[in-house]
């Protein structure tokens, strides 16, 4: 089967990009590719043949129909207007045509200098490409909307960050790379007609059912807000901290995008800060819902030329509704509740307070809870708490709540184990794979990718364990 590409972005939004070619790396070589995703997309296996060099995965060749561009956008970073940003090291190679007219962006990260590189070198490093590949695939298999990773190319090109590292490229796929920052760019340039063109493009290609509806813009923004709310709810329930929620890192389609200083909670700490550059804690774990709302308000400002204020405010309310509704539903599932009862929030908050006091592992606590039997006061979870009396008191109330529903243990446990993962991408697991890869050993990278494809399967190895001492509180920065 021949891959087909189109260039809708390039053809329809000429003010939003610069056309240019990738700059290949020295001695580039393919070290990993996503075999399952490649099969789903009918990508010929021959394209991954190492004897052909890095090929399209390293920017050495293009596939027929590809028309590479670097996109321009702006944004607020850490709450401050940063002005023009853009693809400083990434290039949109093309949009693969899929069934029923949908498309998939092929975006090559680390592809070299662009007009938007500012003071950067246009490169990505092996460390960051491995982290993004692992994180995006982990999120996908957790059922959370995200970009995807298709391939990683390593090289001998030296790249200077805090220390000297080596350059790499990541092929990232997404239904769209349209960001809040695209709209901000033209709004602050006082070009509202181009802001509207972006909205028209989004509606035409991602929400075509609204194209001929008079209130299409208001409906579209409501859906953007709702998708954002559901996304943030998913992050909070799985213990994911993005780390750098700038407006240019926010997807119009409600995808998790731009994995940098992210982290999954180890110990339950609602104030967890994954990014060591975030000195004020703006992007701490428990502040993510408020930051997402703030970012939506910045996007709403750009839409004021063609959406009424009341409609924008209704959409922002929709964000809150979607966030709270989805979060509540997901947390009830994590607790094994099939109905909503008035004291559920209090019971959950009591558990969170107990976990915070004890430093309980977020993922392991909920996974162990999913093995609870209604009639048994014993639980392996009890042994993880120091204050056994406090746990026993909470656990008695929890089992009493379970007994209010006519659901047998087997069915409830099955539901809980579908939403409470045994494995998440802890920073120490990613670092172990990176350390080995930087020494030329890719086995752990491949092994970890396989493990992350089955996050809801119980394991008795260290992929499902708490981090070792060296792996606790690993510092992660925006440097990539």
Curated annotation (Swiss-Prot):
InterPro entries: adnlytase_SelO, SelO. It is an enzyme of class 2 (transferase). One of its GO terms (molecular function) is ATP binding. It catalyses: L-seryl-[protein] + ATP = 3-O-(5'-adenylyl)-L-seryl-[protein] + diphosphate; L-threonyl-[protein] + ATP = 3-O-(5'-adenylyl)-L-threonyl-[protein] + diphosphate; L-tyrosyl-[protein] + ATP = O-(5'-adenylyl)-L-tyrosyl-[protein] + diphosphate; L-histidyl-[protein] + UTP = N(tele)-(5'-uridylyl)-L-histidyl-[protein] + diphosphate. The active site is at residue 248. It comes from the Bacteria. ATP binds at residues 86, 88-89, 109, 121-122, 172, 179, 258. Its cofactor is Mg(2+); Mn(2+). Nucleotidyltransferase involved in the post-translational modification of proteins. It can catalyze the addition of adenosine monophosphate (AMP) or uridine monophosphate (UMP) to a protein, resulting in modifications known as AMPylation and UMPylation. This is Protein nucleotidyltransferase YdiU. It comes from Salmonella enteritidis PT4 (strain P125109).
